[in-house]
Amino acid sequence: MPTMGDPRFVRSVIYVCAHNADGALGLIINNKMNSPSFLEILEQLEIPASHNTKNEIKDVYFGGPVETARGFILHSLEYNAGDTLVVDNEIGMTASLGIIKELAAGTGPNNSLFALGYAGWGAGQLDNEMQKNAWLSVDPDLDLIFNEVVDLKWDKALEKVGVNAALLSTESGHA
């Protein structure tokens, strides 16, 4: 949003996975990383990749600046391991080696987004930023999360709330 001063979050679309009195946690879903690739991560973890996995390009996203060496998988809920955080009735988040192994074997969830790191807020911080118009809130959308072209996610998220990105301004209160 125009009032977001932190360059790590400029034009970011973040799916908030948890938000309570203690704080909030979310994953940036529109910042694809050039490196490492999913196959490189599998090699580092010494996890064999199936033939299908090697031929399928699995993107890796910068999920946020916290715990950037840790993988977080946002996914559809037909997959629900014991350690899955159920976010809503369609989406879960799992951060285990087990789901990475299943993705490598081609047996993981139907829809998934692999992110390194997460965006985190302390108690009341996200609410405060929302009140200052640093963020806009959009209803969850499976297509936006899993199927939309990465470079179009920000514009598509704004369209969902009736905002034209071209009309946004970083200036306010000047006559």
Task: List each language-model region with its residue ranges.
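A short aromatic-anchored loop/beta-hairpin motif
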Residues: 1-115, 119-175
